[in-house]
Design a protein with these regions (language model features):
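Flexible loop/turn connectors
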Residues: 240, 246-309
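Extracytoplasmic "Venus flytrap"
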Residues: 21-42, 46-50, 57-74, 87-94, ...
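Hydrophobic alpha-helical
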Residues: 43, 69, 85-108, 177, ...
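Short, solvent-exposed amphipathic alpha-helices that sit
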Residues: 35-52, 140-144, 168-188, 201, ...
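Flexible loop/hinge segments that line or gate small-molecule binding clefts
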Residues: 99-139, 157, 251-257, 263-264
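Hydrophobic alpha-helical segments within soluble ligand-binding/sensing domains
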Residues: 69, 131-158, 202-203, 254, ...
């Protein structure tokens, strides 16, 4: 973000009377996914940078339930008397508003990622809703689709296995596929169905697609890595090898599969940084280190970074991001970010 990507100048007149030692929580889907584990590892790195132990980061695991997400956050607000900072993926977009309103009403602070409705903005809620970060998934998903279509020889049938239908990233990743299809008239989208980001559901859905479409399927576009693992299992069960498949998230297992040629591509969103910086924004706003309403809008709603990973660069990518996790300055809030969110 050019000149905007500088650490906040702490101290001096920026400091305000606020919460001296806020409890810190991350509200997220599950620990079964390498993606969410990496998000949490970022949150743990943030609390360790504050001289706290990893287990001082409270995990509010919603198990894919928006109702549980909201209930757990309300319980945490009650337990802490609102003296807390929360990082959160609201699970689906409509749930973000009741979550951030509950946080505001308790006098706590929250930063969100991925899911919110387009009409909900931090500056409309106030300083207690510090920031929202998402990732601009449409273009990277279009890139993976083009890689897939080239591998298919520009013809044949493709199926898409998506995330939770109401999730912003699920919508954007399917849109990316559809954008790429416009340039490939000889490729047919046979079907697109949600697999809820889940490996088991990915296996079941791919098995169903194979039953319905058989050898009409010549390529598979997956909304995340977990789904792709399930697709590979379903194909293996039918003795199908070398099916072109693309995925998304850049998890370690997926990068290994890219290096082995079992996946054509995945997209990395740096969840470790995302998990740490989202918690950091909420924490430092809560302590009064900065006042969100004094920041420009591109610091309240912004895109996170994305990196396309293909076989030719997978080894270098693995060495840079996975073999040793980079260390980050958790006060450099917007360093790797990618500009203000744009709405259609």
């Amino acid at each position: 973000m050019g000149a905007m990507a500088v650490p906040f100048a702490f101290g001096g007149s920026a400091a305000r009377a606020a919460i001296s030692d806020p409890a810190i929580a991350w509200s997220y889907r599950d620990r079964a996914s390498a993606y969410w584990n990496s998000i949490v590892s970022g949150g743990e790195a943030l609390v360790e940078s504050l001289g706290k132990t990893k287990d001082s980061l409270v995990s509010l695991i919603n198990e894919g339930s928006s109702e549980k997400s909201l209930a757990d956050i309300k319980a945490f607000l009650a337990k802490t008397g609102g003296k807390c900072a929360i990082a959160c993926d609201a699970n689906d977009s409509p749930n973000a508003r009741p979550v951030v309103e509950a946080v505001r009403d308790a006098g706590a602070y929250i930063s969100t990622i991925w899911n919110k409705t387009d009409d909900l903005h931090p500056w409309d809620i106030g300083d207690n809703y510090v920031s929202h970060m998402t990732w601009s998934d449409e273009k990277p998903a279009e890139q993976t689709a083009r890689i897939l279509f080239d591998a298919m020889g520009g013809k044949g049938g493709v199926v898409h296995l998506g995330g939770i239908a109401a999730n912003n990233p699920a919508i954007e990743r399917l849109n990316g596929l559809k954008n790429a299809l416009k340039d490939f008239p000889d490729i047919e989208l046979l079907d697109a169905q949600p697999a809820d980001w889940d490996t088991t559901k990915g296996t079941e859905l791919m098995a169903s697609f194979l039953t319905r479409f058989g050898d009409k399927i010549t390529g598979v576009h997956c909304a995340n890595d977990n789904i792709a693992y399930g697709v590979i299992e379903a194909l293996r069960a039918e003795g199908i090898e070398n099916m072109p498949i693309v995925a998304y998230d850049g998890n370690p297992e997926a990068v290994k599969l890219v290096m082995e040629g079992k996946l054509l591509a995945t997209v990395f969103t740096n969840p470790h940084w995302g998990g740490g910086i989202t918690a950091a924004l909420a924490y430092y706003a809560a302590t009064g280190a900065f006042k969100p309403s004094e920041e420009p809008k591109e610091h309240r709603e912004f895109y996170g970074p994305t990196v396309l990973v293909t076989k030719k660069d997978a080894a270098d990518f693995k060495a840079k991001y996975l073999d040793a996790v980079p260390s980050y300055n958790w006060k450099d809030f917007w360093g790797p970010s990618n500009g203000q969110i744009k709405y259609k």
